[in-house]
């Protein structure tokens, strides 16, 4: 696949991660065995606001890792960025699940967070030639 095709695929992923209610995970939801929340409206609203910020961070992490993976020159670096992005998908899924539990939505700015982070990741790795990333 050429660079343009890869870039188009990444745009598609970005839209899915930032707009869809992504809930596919490889690890169990950490709150699955916790009792039902008995939050009043103020607590629920505050919790949802905090979770929306957390969700935005997870969307941005996807963009950063995906951008770095796209432009990394070394295959090992690309693999590590792909693996990091894959691990972060669980966090994104958990944030979506919690927002659903709180009857809330993610930020409308999620596509912007993804796009800006993707751009930063792509630009940062275009010029780096480090042999490995610290583990």
Q: Which residues does each PLM region occupy?
A:
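Helix-loop segments that flank and shape redox-cofactor active sites
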Residues: 29-46, 61-80
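Conserved small/polar residues in nucleotide/adenosyl-binding loops
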Residues: 126-132
